[in-house]
Design a protein with these regions (language model features):
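RNA-interacting cores
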Residues: 1-186
């Protein structure tokens, strides 16, 4: 396996949405369930629901700092490879391990980001026939550098890897793509 460093630099804001809230054993999911099970919610209940959704959607590393997980970056690259009809090749030929720091100007911890208020995106989403307001972390300008391992038996060369990454940048990463999460590669 060869290793190459890719740098993603934002063209559009990144909206995060981790799968934590789908896990019924996750503490954030349990807290959200308690709040949403209430029939009559107060204003402060709605604020707590928003906060729970936001924290549950944020990708953080072991130090509590925003990051992009390897599996998210890898899935993004696989999506980019599909433009060249190389989706299955990329699935078998690309590996991104670990969490990679999200680079941005602003507060660095989840609590500071929440308190700042500038990293909150509230928008209506369709669930079945209903429209419900959801809260997500948003990063207006961001970058991420990470290492990708690639199999030279499947990915021809580094040039093909960069073509795949540039294609991924047109599709974007995170929630509500391709409008959000678009990036350029260096």
């Amino acid at each position: 396996m060869n290793t190459t460093t890719l740098n993603f630099n934002s063209l559009m804001p990144l909206i995060m949405h981790s799968g934590r809230l789908a896990d019924p054993l996750d503490p954030a999911s349990q807290m959200l369930k308690k709040l949403t099970d209430k029939k009559k919610k107060t204003h402060s209940d709605h604020l707590e629901v928003s906060k729970c959704e936001w924290y549950g959607s944020l990708y953080v590393d072991d130090d509590g700092k925003p990051c992009l997980p390897g599996e998210v970056l890898e899935a993004c690259l696989v999506e980019g490879a599909r433009k060249f009809k190389l989706g299955k090749v990329a699935k078998g030929g690309l590996v991104v391990l670990g969490n990679f720091a999200l680079q941005f100007n602003g507060p660095k911890t989840a609590d500071e980001l929440w308190e700042n208020g500038g990293y909150l995106k509230r928008a209506g989403v369709r669930i079945g026939q209903q429209r419900i307001i959801r809260s997500r972390p948003i990063f207006p300008a961001w970058a991420c550098s990470f290492e990708v391992m690639w199999d030279p038996g499947l990915i021809t060369d580094e040039g093909q890897l960069f073509d795949i990454a540039r294609s991924a940048g047109q599709s974007g990463i995170g929630d509500w793509r391709p409008k959000f999460g678009r990036f350029e590669v260096s």
